[in-house]
């Protein structure tokens, strides 16, 4: 099954504790802890991503980037990237999976991203200005 916004929303609606909003090209899914995951369907893959913090809030970008490269593989199914949004760079956590993935795999990806966001924020907190922690 190739996923689209409608089919992902139908699946997300079955998950307890998830709040779903349809946006122009993605779904915004929030859990009961206030973590937001944005899911983008494409022809070949689904991307699930969550904003971590703005690059401008990082005290030591080189140090953080070195730590990210050494540690992001410690948490399953999720990696770290930098994405520009409205002219500002943000660190994001994301996962990618095949657009032919089974529904259980899609749910696992989103659930894992929800869990990993908090872990990444804790792991990288020493590199952030106080107001971002």
Predicted features, each with a name:
Residues 1-38, 73-85:
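Charge-rich, low-complexity N-terminal segments
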Residues 7, 63-66, 108-119:
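Long, highly charged amphipathic alpha-helices
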Residues 26-27, 46, 89-91:
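Hydrophobic residues embedded in beta-strands of well-ordered beta-sheets
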Residues 37-54:
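A short acidic-to-branched-hydrophobic micro-motif
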Residues 49-89:
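Short, internal acidic amphipathic alpha-helical interface segments
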Residues 72, 114-125:
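Short amphipathic alpha-helical signal-transduction/dimerization elements
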Residues 81-112:
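A short, solvent-exposed beta-edge/loop patch
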Residues 125-133:
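Short, highly charged C-terminal tails/helix-capping segments
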């Amino acid at each position: 099954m190739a996923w689209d916004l409608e089919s992902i929303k139908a699946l997300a609606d079955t998950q307890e504790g998830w709040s779903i909003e349809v946006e122009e090209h993605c779904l915004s899914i929030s859990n009961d802890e206030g973590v937001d995951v944005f899911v983008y369907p494409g022809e070949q893959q689904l991307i699930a991503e969550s904003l971590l913090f703005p690059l401008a809030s990082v005290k030591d970008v080189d140090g953080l980037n070195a730590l990210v490269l050494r540690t992001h593989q410690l948490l399953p199914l999720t990696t770290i990237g930098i994405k520009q949004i409205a002219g500002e760079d943000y660190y994001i956590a994301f996962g990618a999976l095949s657009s032919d993935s089974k529904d259980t795999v899609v749910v696992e990806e989103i659930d894992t991203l929800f869990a990993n966001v908090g872990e990444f924020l804790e792991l990288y907190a020493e590199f952030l200005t106080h107001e971002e922690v």
